[in-house]
Amino acid sequence: MKRRNILFILSALILLIVGGLTWGSFYMLNYSLRPDKNKETKEESLAYMFREYPYIKPWIDSLQEVGALRDTNIYSPANNVKLHAYYIKASRPTTHTAVIVHGYTDNAIRIMQIGYMYNHDLGFNILLPDLQYHGQSEGNAIQMGWQVS
């Protein structure tokens, strides 16, 4: 009888641990793929960039003034989600284009300082995409590289 109770308690404990780990895994996966804080507005992102990198304000203002900061949208063929990007042509014609991709929970505006270097200093065309569920792109979760087209 005593052995049977020990087996029952151990089985229940193992089941509880496995259930807790499974629940925790799904919770963390949902938390990491759908964070609430990554949806800054364009104005909030620009304010941050002008505060942290004041040298890009005249550049961005001049791009907006001449219409060189172009919003581009495409629809992903994989899941028909609208994806947003900024495209900035170089001041002189060139075949060089830099695709500059932001990191986890960031957006295209918050990497403009790198775009400045490629466009202003090196003379490249630049494409700054907002990945799915970031910035102005749509989607219901962050993609981690799989099924991204």
Predicted regions located by residue number:
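The serine-hydrolase catalytic nucleophile loop
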Residues: 104-118, 138
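N-terminal membrane-anchoring alpha-helices
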Residues: 1-57
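Short amphipathic alpha-helical segments
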Residues: 3-4, 87-88, 112-113, 140
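Short beta-strand element of the alpha/beta-hydrolase
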Residues: 95-103
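Conserved alpha/beta-hydrolase
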Residues: 118-138
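N-terminal cap/lid segment of alpha/beta-hydrolase-fold proteins
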Residues: 53-92
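Catalytic nucleophile-loop/oxyanion-hole region of alpha/beta-hydrolase
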Residues: 105, 132-149
